[in-house]
Amino acid sequence: MFPCTDGLKYKGYLFPPINFLEGIQTTYPRMVSQKKYTKLGSLKDYQDLLERLKKIPSMISQIIDLLKQGMREGVTYPRESLNGVDDQFEKLQGDVEDSPFYVRFRDMPGSLGRHVVSRIKTEAFNITENEILPAFRRLQEFIKYEYSSALRSPPGVSSIPDGAEFYQATLSWHLGTDLSPQEVKLDIKHPLFYLLTSSFTHRFKILASRRWKPSRKKQKLLSRRWDSI
């Protein structure tokens, strides 16, 4: 077994979620706005969601602090990881009425109580307009005007301090084995491929079973960007 705490020394926390696949600018709006991720039925459900939304600006401030620390220590994202991220942030800056952070409150049923619904809707609108969207704008501009200058050109993690050790630790965590990267070949015909993908999230299992075909060249697989994820 490999406890999570064993990996703290490799400072993976200096890669907070801002990349084009799993950024706070995409996962949180989707989680809040889509009913399949956040089910709202009772008044308490809406109140709880509102309390969670209030914490987003603080979370974004923490992300900026971690990115700044990463810049100081030479642990930053590769340039490719942030392709299209600015556009993702920009999509959030629109009419508050249609904001993914507000739409669930906009559509609150009056049956929950006219006065309390009005109060919660007003509070959610104000928080979205005055706190959440400005916080996302602040992170967007920090990435665009400051962090982007520190992005590393080599995409491999070996280009960061102790990167080879970081890679080995990540491999050991996902595979549950001490095999070196040289010993593990990511071949879709190899049983270890399925062991590796099974330790990732569900979407990677789907990609492995439906979209990674044996006829595809490995280099093409590694360089391809899955915009549909």
Each predicted region: which residue ranges?
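N-terminal maturation segment of proteins
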Residues: 1-229
